[in-house]
Amino acid sequence: MKANRDFGRDGGPFSITPNRFQPKSSGNPIFRQKTIRTVGIIALTLVLFLFFHRSFFSSFGEFPSFSSTANAPNSDVQEYDLRKVMNAKFTGDYSPKEKVLICAPLRNAAEHLNMFFGHMNNLTYPHELIDLAFLISDTDDNTLEVLKQHLDAIQNDEDESKHFNNVLIMLKDFGAIFGQEFSDRHGFAAQGPRRKLMARARNWLLSAAIQPYHSWVYWRDVDVETAPNTILEDLMRHDKDIIVPNVYRPLPDWLGNEQPYDLNSWAESETALQLADTLGEDDVIVEGYAEYATWRPHLAYLRDPNGDPSVEMPLDGIGGVSIMSKAKVHLEGCEFPAFSFEKHAETEGFGKMAKRMGFSVYGLPHYVIWHIYEPSDDDKRIMAEMERERKEREAAELEEAKKYQTAGFTQPDDQGAEEGPLAHADDHVD
């Protein structure tokens, strides 16, 4: 049949002749053996070269180093024992070399940086164990330039013990619409949105700066006027997950000399819990305002000037002027809520969240640091009124002096005789 012819094995268009594959001649066997031996030697040489020269790979970005030690030079693999971080505890001994991350959010802070770096320069905790991190946001002054000047001076100080381990500067705007005047920052209407925005800034700063080797995180406002040089050690010694000092501010004599500044450190009250139940989902309770009467015990109002500075008070909410936190608190996911968490945000929400997660939160009612004095609008009105009264009083005194001068000093009469109440003061009767 033609089918066999067309598709069979008898020479048709699809036939294969011969029917069995015949390999080409194998050639000279001696030549083939030499070739195999040469290729083998080249391959072995290449393997040995790569084995003894691992750095060959490191010159190419796509080839990672094979080193697994944290301290190996030029290593891309780093190893950290987080058990040390989780068990951070300061007992006065610096030998464990527990590193501290100091975080400072900045906004139009140029005028305060000289004071801030004066404090940083005098810290007694070893500077080689301290990292500094700054986030500059929504700023229209020369904060960045002034910051760099101070950092350049301190990091190039002849005394190397003044040098900090590492410094990080970040710039990120958040669209802040609130001014930096005292009343702008502390007005009731601004508190909820402002706290949420500040929480975002803190979280950006924290997440970008914290490292696996940090044992502690210390938050510090740059406008603190007075604080002990030993503040890091003082707060660490209490061995709390989160701890804050009391914060006051000085006042002019006519305002009473001093005043509690940070009312955001408090213990919860039943009244406040009931108030929270009446608020909307996004509402935020803020302290120190008549609109929210919480009747909470405030750390600031429990201060005794002669009290023991080591006395501790358990807290639920905390202020943000000065916070010492173990790094594990942040590493386990506790940050600053930029939303209403149990009707609180930012640092107060941070305290609430930490308590919910089982961390210890404390304050020191008799251990005080001092914030700068910034006059509020009410203070400015009082000062303006006092200035007006002072000028009126001076004008009245000047007018009275003129009247006294007119009445008290004598004037000569037409004949040269003195007239007036002093004219005959020296007369005497024989």
Swiss-Prot record:
Residues 1-28, 387-430 are annotated as: Disordered. Residues 58-430 are lumenal. Its main location: endoplasmic reticulum. InterPro entries: Mannan_Polymerase_Subunit, Nucleotide-diphossugar_trans. Glycans are attached at residue 122. Belongs to the ANP1/MMN9/VAN1 family. This is Mannan polymerase II complex anp1 subunit.
